[in-house]
Amino acid sequence: MATAPNILLFLTDDHAQWAMGCAGNSELRTPTFDYLAQNGTRFANAFTPIPVCSPARACLHTGRLASQHGLHDYLNSNDPAVNSIHWLENETTLAQLFQAAGYQTGQFGKWHLGQDEHAAAGYDEWFSLGRDYPIPHEGPFRYGVNGRFQTLPGRISHNITEHAAQFLRARDAERPFFMTVGYYATHSPWQGQSERLAASYRNATFADVPQNETYPFGRQALESLNETRHNPREALAQYYAAVTEIDTAVGRLIDELESLGQLENTIIIYTADHGLNTGHHGIWGKGNGTLPLNMVEESIRVPLIWYDGRSASADVPLPQIRTEFVDHLDTFLTILDVAGIAPPDKNYVGRTYQRLLHNQTIPEWRAVQFGEYGNVRMLRTSRHKLVYRYPDGPNELFDLAADPREMNNIINREDMQTIVQAFIERLEGFFTRYEDPAKSGLRVRDLPRHNSSEAWRTS
């Protein structure tokens, strides 16, 4: 096990794919992310299988669709009925697989998959955000620490980072580690960020964020209805500050790895549970930022960067920017693959893309991305996107080449009907092949309630 690679997986909340310097944002300061991308592999077409917190996290941790693991919306951890359910009870997670392979495991930051104060199966060390939602960005705040609550002062990002660093310093040097770190600063409320950082962005032009867009296919919801819309420039300054704060925190852990002599044997993966709109399409939020639920690009795209500390001695030309479609389900299998751990015998949707990390091609890699959110399902190709809402719509088809801002729904156009029918058949064939009928998003009204605001019960 001495030569097995360490794995450091960052799963940030609400970090939009567009919100990085290395992804083309001209004003955001993200030197750590830019360094990882410059010395690693960035995926320009990385997606979430479902654009909302808890189920997206479940997808990455289990490698399974929401319609397989059965978690379809964000969990209201303050609700005793919701918190009493073992949502991933019958699933096998990355942590369980790495622990069984002899790895020392730790989770730090946001978990949001139920019973957050207790260490989830597979984790040796546990430091999670507590159940006091909404979460402020600065304490005092309750954390779940190895089965008990502990209230700590200070900024949440700082506390997550320091406990993760303590784990690195105290770990068994004879064993490799697998650790997950979930930063939260980019989540609403978009206020209360570091004043120093927020002030540094208040004079920004925010030219990379579309201005004055409207959403013609539904009404605004959740974050879209709060005070953010009354002062969007300040909200953007706060969001940019949050991204820079997280960038600094990630850099702090990289420095810790380097000081411990572990960076050269560590694989770092940085991603987010889902994307985010900060005025894009007139929306503030993700898939549940509108009613009906949306699948706009900014909601479904996620950042994804792989950095392999061993690459300095490998014949891999860097940096790489890959344009293949990948998602959390693929990333689950790839993380196992790079560590040499076999996945369980389950009906996994994804494929390992380890060869892409080595600048190789993978024959017959898919040219389509599927998604879901409750009774909403999506099929996206490089040219078109179908959003299909069961059982009665409204449904959408977009030509992403001609209409990249997704403003013109062409689903009823006569010349599109062949494409529409082919997409519907492919969408239904995909879910018929993979979904668990007992946990399907098409029967969410019959499944346990996740929160009191589920779109399928309130819209």
Question: What name fits each language-model region?
Answer:
Residues 296-297, 307-309, 369-412, 447-459:
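C-terminal, low-complexity/hydrophilic appendages and adjacent surface loops
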Residues 30, 60, 101, 110, ...:
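Polar, surface-exposed loop/tail segments
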Residues 28, 119-122, 129, 191-194, ...:
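Histidine-centered active-site microenvironments of extracellular/periplasmic hydrolases
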Residues 71-100, 112-240, 448:
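Formylglycine-dependent
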Residues 9-10, 16-106, 117, 125-140:
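Active-site segment of extracytoplasmic enzymes that catalyze sulfate/phosphate-ester chemistry
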Residues 1-5, 12, 16-17, 42, ...:
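Long, internal low-complexity/basic segments
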Residues 22-24, 41-64, 72, 107-119, ...:
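Short, solvent-exposed turn/loop segments enriched in Gly/Ser/Thr/Pro and often Arg
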Residues 61, 132-149, 222-230, 251-255, ...:
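Substrate-binding rim/cap in mid-to-C-terminal beta-strand-loop elements of soluble/periplasmic
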